[in-house]
From Swiss-Prot:
The keyword Membrane does not apply. It comes from Trachypithecus obscurus. The active site is at E53, D71. This is Lysozyme C. Belongs to the glycosyl hydrolase 22 family. SMART domains: LYZ1. Lysozyme C is capable of both hydrolysis and transglycosylation; it also shows a slight esterase activity. It acts rapidly on both peptide-substituted and unsubstituted peptidoglycan, and slowly on chitin oligosaccharides. Gene3D superfamilies: 1.10.530.10. PROSITE patterns: GLYCOSYL_HYDROL_F22_1 (PS00128), GLYCOSYL_HYDROL_F22_2 (PS51348). Residues 19-148 form the C-type lysozyme domain. It catalyses: Hydrolysis of (1->4)-beta-linkages between N-acetylmuramic acid and N-acetyl-D-glucosamine residues in a peptidoglycan and between N-acetyl-D-glucosamine residues in chitodextrins.
Length: 148
């Protein structure tokens, strides 16, 4: 009986772990989900953004004490403007999505919300990590050898 309980706990912990994408795996997935060239943003820029926002980790979160918001998932989408975590004061929820949906291994919801973010006037510049690490840089290395 004890062995079954331990096995159950191990299996439970495996199911809640986030996925850390390999660079090319992410590039292929983002391409399939329609991000390559979306709103004029190249696939390499999206992969660069994900690298510096989350390290390609779907389960990444970052709490921002200044405004009591949290960034979620592979693109670190913020609960102040884009998703609903039920905790952020004055949240907008422009993507009409639960923030927990942005932590799934299947990143379709995260991509859909990222498309919403990049559709705003600020575009890809909404992401600080993109401005700091990808803007005006040769980002071709992020898709090199990926066959995309």
């Amino acid at each position: 009986m004890r062995a079954l309980i331990i096995l159950g706990l191990v299996l439970l912990s495996v199911t809640v772990q986030g996925k850390i994408f390999e660079r090319c795996e992410l590039a292929r997935t983002l391409k399939k989900l329609g991000l390559d060239g979306y709103k004029g943003v190249s696939l390499a820029n999206w992969v660069c953004l994900a690298k510096w926002e989350s390290g390609y980790n779907t389960e990444a979160t970052n709490y921002n004490p200044g405004d009591e918001s949290t960034d979620y998932g592979i693109f670190q989408i913020n609960s102040r403007y884009w998703c609903n975590n039920g905790k952020t004061p004055g949240a907008v929820d422009a993507c009409h999505i639960s923030c927990s949906a942005l932590l799934q291994n299947n990143i379709a919801d995260a991509v859909a919300c990222a498309k919403r973010v990049v559709s705003d006037p600020q575009g890809i510049r909404a992401w600080v990590a993109w401005r700091n690490h990808c803007q005006n840089k040769d980002v071709s290395q992020y898709v090199k050898g990926c066959g995309v």
